[in-house]
Swiss-Prot record:
Identification of the protein by name: 4-hydroxyproline 2-epimerase
Keywords assigned: Isomerase
MF (Gene Ontology): 4-hydroxyproline epimerase activity
Residues that coordinate or bind substrate: G90, H91, H209, D233, G238, T239
Family designation: Belongs to the proline racemase family.
Any Pfam family: Pro_racemase
């Protein structure tokens, strides 16, 4: 029997989000974390069908739309990409909220979105831009040294912004859209060095995002973010910007409520600020998403790549 998966695609600052509206199997009525675990354990091929070629792309982030646990929440969502599952996704949440409005599910205002790492608060503004009040962000360790194969010693901060990041300012790389290959090679080597050295986030959390920062003539900073699976973020990265704000706050370089304009490697911009909280900060990220497609993915029984090209 042919499988059908309904999707709506959007992009946030150039970074695509694929919202899965229907077609996935039931994951039960647990929390988003529990449902994510069921999806990963029992139905992972649905993730690969949506995200991997020939129907998807390494760049894309998937977002499975779920009924929320709390009646006060507008939706639940499980994020995933070509390599696995994400706890939270800032650009993806912006895309999800914009798409929920397109579907007629929400109007401008404040909405709660359940994710595997907690409930985030998102505001859909009248101009259809979206502000996401993220989960607690904090710096776990400062100036951690790691030996990077082929590059030598590198120092960076380890911070949580919804995913684990290694943030580097002194890297000697040119952060520009025409230098992505070199940036990817360098960031991949950093991640390999962290893994070899056994350097992790809190409680052994895998540091699967590498973030490089540089000065920018028009904005506060420009960044390159390597995501899990070796794809880079076209957007400024919501969770990465949250992690950056946590480091700035810890160093006393950014006061609560002051807007930080973070540019991506391709020039798209998020506006970010934070409120102080016990154990860290609560960041708010504002950006815009645009709709790009509505489609039904078809998976024929005899298609050898129906569930994706899995390497």
């Amino acid at each position: 029997m042919m499988k059908r998966i309904q999707i709506i695609d959007s992009h946030t600052g150039g970074e695509p989000t694929r919202l899965v509206v229907s077609g996935f199997p039931s994951l039960g009525n647990g929390t988003m974390a529990e449902r994510r675990d069921v999806l990963a354990r029992e139905h992972n091929r649905y993730r690969t069908a949506c995200i991997l070629e020939p129907r998807g792309s390494d760049v894309m982030v998937g977002a499975l739309l779920c009924e929320p646990v709390s009646p006060e929440a507008a939706a639940g969502v499980i994020f995933f990409n070509n390599s696995g599952y994400l706890g939270m996704c800032g650009h993806g949440t912006i895309g999800v909220v914009r798409t929920l409005h397109h579907m007629g599910r929400i109007e401008p205002g404040v909405h709660r979105i359940e994710t595997p790492v907690g409930t985030v608060e998102a505001t859909l503004h009248d101009d259809l831009s979206v502000s996401v009040r993220n989960v607690l962000a904090y710096r776990h360790a400062k100036a951690v040294a790691v030996d990077v194969p082929g590059y030598g010693p590198v120092k960076g901060d380890i911070a949580w912004g919804g995913n684990w990041f290694f943030l580097i300012s002194d890297h000697g790389q040119r952060v520009a859209g025409d230098n992505v290959a070199a940036l990817t090679a360098y960031s991949s080597a950093v991640r390999e060095g962290l893994e070899r050295a056994g350097i992790t986030g809190a409680n052994g959390g895998e540091i699967d995002h590498i973030e490089l920062f540089a000065d920018d003539a028009e904005h506060d900073s420009r960044s390159f973010v390597l995501c899990p699976g070796h794809a880079y973020d076209r957007s400024p990265c919501g969770t990465g910007t949250s992690a950056k704000l946590a480091c700035l706050a810890a160093d006393g370089k950014l006061e609560p409520g002051v807007v930080w304009r973070q540019a991506s490697v391709i020039g798209s911009v998020f506006q970010a600020s934070y409120a102080q909280a016990d154990g860290g900060i609560v960041p708010t990220i504002r950006g815009s998403a645009h709709l790009s497609a509505e489609a039904t993915l078809l998976i024929e029984e005899d298609d050898p790549f129906g569930w994706g090209i899995v390497s």
